[in-house]
Amino acid sequence: MKVSLFITCLSDVFFPQVGKSVVEIMNQCGVELDFPEGQTCCGQPAYNSGYQEDAKLAAKQMIKAFEHSEYIVTPSGSCASMVHHYYKEMFKGDSEWYEKAVHLADRTYELTDFVVNILGKNDWKSKLVEKAVFHQSCHMSRALGIKEEPLKLLSQVEGLDIKELPYCQDCCGFGGTFAVKMSSISETMVDEKIKHIEATEANLLIGADMGCLMNIGGRLRRENKNIQVLHVAEVLAKGLNK
């Protein structure tokens, strides 16, 4: 089985350790991994801001970059959702590119979805002793319907005590450009999320979308909260070394 890594902008620029963790996870699963260098932003910020033509250019570049990939795996439910839902929407009136968009979507998977449902991994052997909560991101849980897969993998990490996060389905307030355009509302939303996290007395927040982790983690640091923030890939990879 050959897998291509769709690294995403946030991992490339702000969370390189997440990309490294995905490589470790794929190696542990015995998967042959490559990295198409032609990949770029999925186009979601442009699309959500109304710049349709710019988003199409990004989408076409992504389609070309992964044209020959057997499977495409990304550590982001948000970017996977963009490929699955909005590429097809953008190219509805263009039969050639619509077909290519469908072909790309059919091969693109969020990381935990791929590990659980394609690789069938039900015996993840790792160890990390922490009290944690898991944040369900909007795009991953609502748009892709992926809710149980990350929790299933985390439940297999020895020593990891996952507490139930109150109102876990509530948005953290990031929403890409929403956090910039509606900053005061976004700030209120992330403060509410942090209150719910603190109520569990967890010392670790785990998530599967780096936008959410950047938003919540940034607020935690500004408020001097002693709560660590990790991507699910980092947790699974950390455990492999214990």
UniProtKB/Swiss-Prot annotation:
Pfam annotation, one family: CCG
Single GO MF annotation: oxidoreductase activity
GO biological process: lactate metabolic process
GO cellular component terms listed in the entry, alphabetical order: cytosol
Protein family membership: Belongs to the LutA/YkgE family.
Main function: Is involved in L-lactate degradation and allows cells to grow with lactate as the sole carbon source.
Protein's recorded name: Lactate utilization protein A 2
Species of the source: Bacillus anthracis
